């Protein structure tokens, strides 16, 4: 459960991420593919090279979904319901991959906003991403 301080930290962080969400999403995906090569198996039809249009497009989807989640912190299940269905029933993504992408997202945000990435913000974003991951895997049962 996100505390009021966590919610403030997440909203503040996403205020700074703002127009860069698609860029950061793509960068986090690239980090994930490089650091955890087994994650590439879910994207056999993608050009996974640096800067590819497909990775950028998927990064935009990731960024948009996280921005939507940050805008609906008090009702993540409703905000992410369609995405949860997609990942559970059609894509069947192994839940561990959400943790890997979350880690890469944190690294990306820290790299772009080192002065703002305090331990408190780090903890809040980590909780937020864990909550998003929980919602996305909630329909796997």
Curated annotation (Swiss-Prot):
Q: Which CDD domains match?
A: Hb-alpha-like
Entry keyword set: Acetylation, Heme, Iron, Metal-binding, Oxygen transport, Phosphoprotein, Transport
Purpose of the protein: Involved in oxygen transport from the lung to the various peripheral tissues.
Q: Which residues carry this modification: N6-succinyllysine?
A: 7, 11, 16, 40
The modified positions for Phosphothreonine read: 8, 108, 134, 137
Which residue numbers delimit the Globin domain? Answer: 1-141
One GO molecular function term of this record is: organic acid binding
Q: Where Phosphotyrosine occurs, residue numbers?
A: 24
One GO cellular-component annotation of the UniProt record comes to: haptoglobin-hemoglobin complex
Q: Name one GO biological process term.
A: hydrogen peroxide catabolic process
UniProt gene name:
HBA
Q: Which residues carry this modification: N6-acetyllysine?
A: 16
- Protein name as it appears in the record: Hemoglobin subunit alpha
Give the source lineage, highest ranks first. Eukaryota, Metazoa, Chordata, Craniata, Vertebrata
Q: Where, in this chain's numbering, is heme b bound?
A: 87
Which tissues is this protein detected in according to the database? Red blood cells.
Q: Which InterPro entries match?
A: Globin, Globin-like_sf, Globin/Proto, Hemoglobin_a-typ, Hemoglobin_oxygen_transport, Hemoglobin_pi
Can you state the subunit structure given in the record?
Answer: Heterotetramer of two alpha chains and two beta chains.
Q: Residue positions of the PTM Phosphoserine?
A: 3, 49, 102, 124, 138
Q: List the disulfide bonds.
A: none
Q: Which family does it belong to?
A: Belongs to the globin family.
Listed binding positions for O2 are 58
């Amino acid at each position: 459960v996100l505390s009021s301080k966590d919610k403030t930290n997440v909203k503040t962080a996403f205020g700074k991420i703002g127009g860069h969400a698609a860029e950061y999403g793509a960068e986090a995906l690239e980090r994930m593919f490089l650091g955890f090569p087994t994650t590439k198996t879910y994207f056999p039809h993608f050009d996974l090279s640096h800067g590819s249009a497909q990775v950028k497009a998927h990064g935009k989807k990731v960024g948009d979904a996280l921005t939507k989640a940050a805008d609906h912190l008090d009702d993540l299940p409703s905000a992410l319901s369609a995405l949860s269905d997609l990942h559970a029933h059609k894509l069947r993504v192994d839940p561990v991959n959400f943790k890997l992408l979350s880690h890469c997202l944190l690294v990306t945000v820290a790299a772009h906003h080192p002065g703002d990435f305090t331990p408190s913000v780090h903890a809040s974003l980590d909780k937020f991403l864990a909550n998003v991951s929980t919602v996305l895997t909630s329909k796997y049962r």
